[in-house]
Amino acid sequence: MAVSRATLFDKVWDLHTVGTLASGQTQLFIGLHLIHEVTSPQAFAMLRERGLGVLYAERTVATVDHIVPTQSQQRPFADTLAEQMIRALEDNCAEFGIRFYNIGSGSQGIVHVIAPEQGFTQPGMTIACGDSHTATHGAFGAIAFGIGTSQVRDVLATQTLALDKLKVRRIEMNGSLHPGVFAKDVILHIIRKLGVKAGVGYAYEFAGTTFEAMNMEERMTVCNMAIEGGARCGYINPDAVTYAYLKGRDFAPQGADWERAVAWWENLRSDPDAQYDDTIHFDAAEIAPTVTWGITPGQGIAVDEIVPRPEELPGEDRPLAEEAYRYMDLAPGVPIVGTKVDVCFIGSCTNGRLSDLREAANLARGRHVAPGVKAFVVPGSERVKRQAEAEGLHEVFLEAGFEWREPGCSMCLAMNPDRLEGRQLSASSSNRNFKGRQGSASGRTLLMSPAMVVAAAVSGAVADVRALLEPTP
């Protein structure tokens, strides 16, 4: 265990250090490896080329999520490449003895949804996955990295990664959030203020009373988008909220093992006098419902603000802003409220969990999607879908004019049939608004909370969700 004055990151890093490589990098043991159908086929092929096997199949969990259709999931898929990729994962998992949650298993879903909900993700773990948003698992006090295909191969073969140790930045936020402000607004606000490159070389520790008051699914939303602020990973110290979420889940410790685990997890928390490379403070009361207007997650504004004028921006931000004005067809100085939307999407590893769907359904109840708007809800997993239907949430969405889909990554990245067409503009609860991200080379994306997506869907345009919270006269 690291000495006192250590952060959780330091403690977990030290506990998982195998050695120091000639390059100066740390060889880090990976406790849990999550794989899916897109970044694993080439990794398995590289194993076979070298005559290698999977070192710890029991520490590997697989599912299909990126390319699966969310309307009909009847096999074989119409998309032959998608069918081939899923068959490859089926075959690879069978050959190497890897636990695999396929469509129809009852537990399939987005990889960053299924691992926490089943209790695979636990405090103090090191976790890797061939997906950018692996930082999601940091919500549990784990250190989780998104990795590339060659690194997927390395973890399969050696259960280790070669990594440079990160600096640690404490993002401290205190205070209560106003009604209509959600975890998604919090992380969009942080990225807006710090920028998309500020976290390069850092792990972000999210701390303070605001994060302590969040439930686990809200914390996952925050950590999920740490990468969008440039951070390699983000995490929150485990606490009673963490333990209450984990207790009794399929792969969480049971009985006496549970008590020992909680005692161990408590020791992993950052020490009260931990030394950080720097600390940045935020006031939760300053955050309003937030929406992106541009082509990076850092180009965000409060919903009641105007699209920023170039002269109001730092000089280094102006070229990208000019590019965003042209691509998004938004004029500087104009309110973002009232911007017409074509598609409204609720889902993704950022906001496709049960609490997200409950909040969205509460706002959709008694309202209806505006004419000309396509709106759909994609549960993050088969378990989320099953529970949402048990609560009747799907009926609320259907009555309000939303489509109710099968689990998958869906329009977050459009490696599946869920895509924008032409210059369509989407209100999306996902995590990236890059050019072409949602399937059309000219499609446009506004990132926002699921509640804000509902407000846009029923209004037919960007709208302030706080108006939906006001009592009807």
UniProtKB/Swiss-Prot annotation:
InterPro entries: 3-IsopropMal_deHydase_lsu, Acnase/IPM_dHydase_lsu_aba_1/3, Acoase/IPM_deHydtase_lsu_aba, Aconitase_4Fe-4S_BS, Aconitase_4Fe-4S_dom, IPM_dehydratase_rel_enz, IPMI_cat. It comes from the Bacteria. One of its GO terms (biological process) is L-leucine biosynthetic process. Its cofactor is [4Fe-4S] cluster. Coiled coil: none annotated. SUPFAM superfamilies: Aconitase iron-sulfur domain. Keywords: 4Fe-4S, Amino-acid biosynthesis, Branched-chain amino acid biosynthesis, Iron, Iron-sulfur, Leucine biosynthesis, Lyase, Metal-binding. [4Fe-4S] cluster binds at C349, C409, C412. Its EC number is 4.2.1.33. It is an enzyme of class 4 (lyase). Pathway: Amino-acid biosynthesis; L-leucine biosynthesis; L-leucine from 3-methyl-2-oxobutanoate: step 2/4. It catalyses: (2R,3S)-3-isopropylmalate = (2S)-2-isopropylmalate. Heterodimer of LeuC and LeuD. Catalyzes the isomerization between 2-isopropylmalate and 3-isopropylmalate, via the formation of 2-isopropylmaleate. This is 3-isopropylmalate dehydratase large subunit.
